[in-house]
Amino acid sequence: MSRIYNFCAGPAMLPAAVMQKAQQELLDWNGLGVSVMEISHRSKEFIALAEQAEVNLRQLMNIPNHYHVLFMHGGGRSQFSNVVNNFLGDHGRALYLVSGQWSQSAVEEAQKLAGEAQIDALNIVTKADGLNQVTLPDLHSIKKDYRYVHYCTNETVDGIEIFDELDSPWPIVADLSSTIMSREIDVSRYGLIYAGAQKNIGPSGLSIVIVRDDMLKLASLPQSSVMDYRIAAENGSMFNTPPTFAWYLAAEVFNWLKGLGGVEVIAQVNQQKAQLLYACIDDNSFYRNGVAKQNRSQMNVTFQLADDSLDSRFLAEAERAGLVALKGHRIVGGMRASLYNAMPLEGVQALVTFMSEFATKHS
C-alpha cells in the first residue's frame, strides 16, 4: 500500500512509530498479557506510566515546578467551561481576545455560563491590504480588574497564529490546543494553559491543563467535582477513571518527541514545512492565502484556488495521490493543510509537488 499523508485538522495523524508500537503491544502491554486499555488506572503499572508521562511533558515544555500538570477528560471545548467554572465565581470578570472561530466559541461559552456582564470580548483581527492580521492590544492601558485574560494562540479554522508573546497585568489563560509542543514557549508567562490532545499530543478524548499554583489556590468552587482543577491536582488526575488509552498514547508521543530531540528540533522542522507550502502558494497565482505573513499559521495552512469550481477536482485528485483531508472548514471553505508535529516533511513535499502539477494542468 502506498503512503497516505493525512492533513486532517483533528483528530490528526499520529506519528507512525507510535502507531506501530501501539499495534505491537495492543494485546500484551508491558508483559502483563493484557492491553493497557484493560488494566486499572490505579495499578502500579499504569501509575508509573502516568508519572513518567508528566515528567517527560515537563521536560519537553520546561514546565516550572510551581505548575500543576493535569490530564483531564474531554477536548478544548470542555476547558472553555472549566476555566469559567474554576476562576470567575459569581462576580469575577474576564477579558477574551478574539482572533477567529475558536476564541469566539470560548467567548460564547463563557458568556453562556457567567453572563455577558462578566465577559468582555475584544476583537484583535483587522484587515490590511485584504489580509487578516493580528494586533495585540496594550492591556496595561485597560483600567479594569479581570480575573484573567483568555486567548487562543492558533486558529485552526482561519489559519491565523499569534507568535508574539502577550503582555498582561492579569493572569493569562491560553488555548494551545493546536500549537502545544510545536514550538518553544515560556510557560512561566501563563497562569493556565490548556490543550485538547487530538492535534499534537494523541487521540481525542484527553486534554492537558498546565496551571500555576497561585491560580489554583485562588480558584472558586465549581459545582461539578470532575471540573474542579484542585480536585484533579490533589488526585493525580485520577479522581474519576481517566481516558487511559489516550493517556498511554500521549505518553508514547512524548517519548517519540524526546527521541527526535525535543520541541526545539521539531519546531525547526515545522517551520521548514510551513515555509515550503507557503512558498508554493505565493509563487503561483493559481493559489492564494488570506493571512498576513506575520500571522500565517504554521500548523494550519489555509488556501483557496483562484477558480473555486476546481475545488472538487483538486480534492479528488489529491486523494488519489495519497493526500487526504485537505478540504477547508465548512465556515471558510477552500483548502486546509494541517502540518502538526506528526506530519513528516516528505508529506508536505508530496503536497507541494501535487499542487504545482495541478496548477500547471489547469491554468
Swiss-Prot record:
Homodimer. HAMAP family: SerC_aminotrans_5. Pathway: Amino-acid biosynthesis; L-serine biosynthesis; L-serine from 3-phospho-D-glycerate: step 2/3; Cofactor biosynthesis; pyridoxine 5'-phosphate biosynthesis; pyridoxine 5'-phosphate from D-erythrose 4-phosphate: step 3/5. GO terms for cellular component: cytoplasm. Pyridoxal 5'-phosphate binds at G76, R77, W102, T156, D175, Q198, N240, T241. GO terms for biological process: L-serine biosynthetic process; pyridoxine biosynthetic process. Its EC number is 2.6.1.52. Belongs to the class-V pyridoxal-phosphate-dependent aminotransferase family. SerC subfamily. L-glutamate binds at R42. NCBIfam families: PRK05355.1, serC_1. It is found in: Cytoplasm. Keywords: Amino-acid biosynthesis, Aminotransferase, Cytoplasm, Pyridoxal phosphate, Pyridoxine biosynthesis, Serine biosynthesis, Transferase. This is Phosphoserine aminotransferase. It catalyses: O-phospho-L-serine + 2-oxoglutarate = 3-phosphooxypyruvate + L-glutamate; 4-(phosphooxy)-L-threonine + 2-oxoglutarate = (R)-3-hydroxy-2-oxo-4-phosphooxybutanoate + L-glutamate. It comes from the Bacteria.
